[in-house]
Amino acid sequence: MRLLGLYRGIDTVELAHNAIALIESEKPAAVVVDATGLGVGTVDELKHCVYRRLVHEFMAGGKAMNNNKHANKRAEAWDAMRAALTAGIELPDDPDWETDLCGTEFGFNNKGAIQLERKDMMKSRGLPSPDLGDSLAMTFAVNVASSLRIPAVSTPINVQPGQELNRWMR
């Protein structure tokens, strides 16, 4: 796992052009773009290029596939990311990753579904928006597993029947 770029303070068209350059150099199976707020312009721009079939819109507040387990798509993606990290995916040794991944709290909504802490609440606790964490989580929002080879987990996870892992990274 490696970070290919971090873009801040550029317009949506420039971001789309940077994404196209990365698509051409890295040849990904899918490109997941945050389609909330300013990201919608980037999605629109990418949908007009030759790589449009690779582009998947991510709506963080959208409906989860299993809304009994996850309050929204963001919670669903973070839960999928947690499972992948538990299975052994390695991240760069960088304190920014740790801050983003460990700073986000979670709880349960009134229906018992996993719900992540809102970004304004994180800000009130003195934490920045978890941009790296959200970006990584979005990569688990699209199922491209059929085209990828996932390495076997070297250490089995002991989960008792009926027990669910419900901590992100702690």
Describe each model-derived feature in a short phrase.
Residues M1-A113, I157-R170:
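Mg2+-dependent endonuclease catalytic cores in nucleic-acid-processing enzymes, primarily RNase H-like
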Residues D93-P156:
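Charge-patterned, long linear interaction tracts outside catalytic cores
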